[in-house]
């Protein structure tokens, strides 16, 4: 599937926020998966590199952090994100055919990719398993896209979410990808060590925009929105930014870790 999220300054900020939240809330899981100083890790579907930078900082110069994304603009952004870190890099490639060396990684991470690749989920996870060394781990993160909530809600922003989900359904994507993670790891021959809900649940900071807004141009091209919708949603975000007290937001995110059998 083509990349649908426009890499604006706001979208890059959203990626950085997600990466820092993940570092704060998933570090114990990462350590259990083998993401630590000196480890070789891969970030498949690395996007603009916010998480790749975090991983590179964790493994340090004694390790390696390699990112892959099919979108050239994302690869360029990721390369910039890890500039100055000689042990980190980003390259173009598909999630199911990365071009990375098989069996060479202590941990392979793939975040928010499977839900955008309906029908190819098992092919992707099987490839991730091949990239991990014997005894290595695959770390998956994805969401239940139907369970995104905000309170107090705004009917216009709820409409944006509904349109974005309809757009994904039309592309054949699986909105419940997060609930598949444990099953996918097992089907790929891995032993599931962790499978849990990770949220987030947080107060929505002013200026934060969801993935649906980043995909607005794609929604228009696909016939799911028009110029009037974009203006209506933009005004709704202006209201959201001024709201006091700040609304609460929840995304039903899931994390799973699968271990490749040791020899």
Regions found by a protein language model. Give the residues of each.
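C-terminal helical/coil "lid" or tail adjacent to the Rossmann-like core of SAM-dependent
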Residues: 4, 10-11, 22, 193-248
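Conserved alpha-helix/loop element of class I SAM-dependent methyltransferases that forms part
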Residues: 20-37, 54
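Class I SAM-dependent methyltransferase SAM/SAH-binding core
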Residues: 42, 48-98
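Helix-to-beta-strand junctions that scaffold the AdoMet/dcAdoMet cofactor pocket
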Residues: 60, 117-118, 132-134
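A short acidic, Gly/Pro-enriched loop at the edge of an enzyme's catalytic core
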Residues: 98-108
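A short SAM/SAH-binding and catalytic strip from SAM-dependent methyltransferases
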Residues: 106-120
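A short glycine-rich, Lys/Arg-flanked "PGG" loop and its adjoining helix->strand segment in the class I
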Residues: 122-137
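Conserved catalytic/acceptor-binding region of the Class I
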Residues: 139-206, 224
């Amino acid at each position: 599937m083509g990349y649908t999220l426009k890499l604006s300054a706001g979208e890059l900020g959203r990626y950085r926020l997600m990466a820092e939240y993940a570092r704060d809330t998933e570090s114990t899981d990462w350590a259990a998966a083998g993401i630590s100083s000196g480890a070789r890790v891969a970030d498949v579907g690395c996007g603009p590199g916010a998480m790749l930078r975090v991983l590179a900082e964790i493994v340090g110069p004694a390790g390696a952090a390699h990112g892959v994304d099919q979108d050239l603009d994302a690869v360029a952004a990721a390369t910039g994100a890890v500039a100055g870190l000689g042990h980190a890099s980003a390259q173009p490639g598909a999630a199911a055919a990365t071009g990375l060396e098989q069996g060479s990684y202590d941990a392979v991470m793939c975040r928010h990719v499977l839900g955008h690749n309906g029908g190819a989920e098992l092919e992707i996870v099987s490839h991730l398993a091949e990239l991990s060394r014997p005894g290595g781990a695959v770390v998956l993160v994805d969401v239940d896209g139907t369970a995104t909530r905000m309170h107090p809600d705004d009917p216009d922003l709820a409409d944006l979410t509904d349109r974005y989900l309809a757009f994904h359904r039309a592309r054949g994507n699986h909105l419940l990808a997060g609930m598949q993670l444990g099953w996918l790891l097992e089907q790929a021959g891995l032993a599931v060590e962790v499978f849990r809900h990770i949220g987030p649940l947080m107060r929505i900071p002013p200026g934060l925009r969801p993935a649906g807004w980043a995909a607005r141009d794609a929604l228009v091209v696909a016939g799911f929105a028009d110029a009037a919708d974009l203006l209506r949603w933009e005004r709704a975000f202006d209201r959201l930014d001024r709201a006091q007290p700040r609304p609460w937001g929840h995304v039903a995110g899931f994390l799973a870790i699968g271990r490749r059998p040791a020899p």
